[in-house]
Swiss-Prot record:
InterPro entries for the chain: Recombinase_CS, Resolv_N, Resolvase-like_N_sf, SSR_resolvase
Xref: Pfam families: Resolvase
Superkingdom of source: Viruses
Domain Resolvase/invertase-type recombinase catalytic, chain residue ranges per copy: 11-82
Residue numbers annotated as active site: 19 (o-(5'-phospho-dna)-serine intermediate)
Family: Belongs to the site-specific recombinase resolvase family.
Keywords annotated in UniProt: DNA integration, DNA invertase, DNA recombination, DNA-binding
Protein's recorded name: Uncharacterized immunity region protein 3
GO terms, molecular function: DNA binding; DNA strand exchange activity
Gene Ontology biological process terms in this record: DNA integration
Amino acid sequence: MNLMDENTPKNVGIYVRVSTEEQAKEGYSISAQKEKLKAYCISQGWDSYKFYIDEGKSAKDIHRPSLELMLRHIEQGIMTHC
């Protein structure tokens, strides 16, 4: 979601989630996701980013605390990209 033009400093919100242990074993662990997404931010020149993490939360559960916090931060303009 790009809310501003290319010249505007970016505050990037990064949401990561794993719902099962099986996913974590297959390389989708929280730490693996963070590592890949941090590398992507660095490759894009984005140095201001925040991770929002929900562990053990199903995608079916719409009440995910970190996702809700990230969405509030977007609404408040704290995060300009996600």
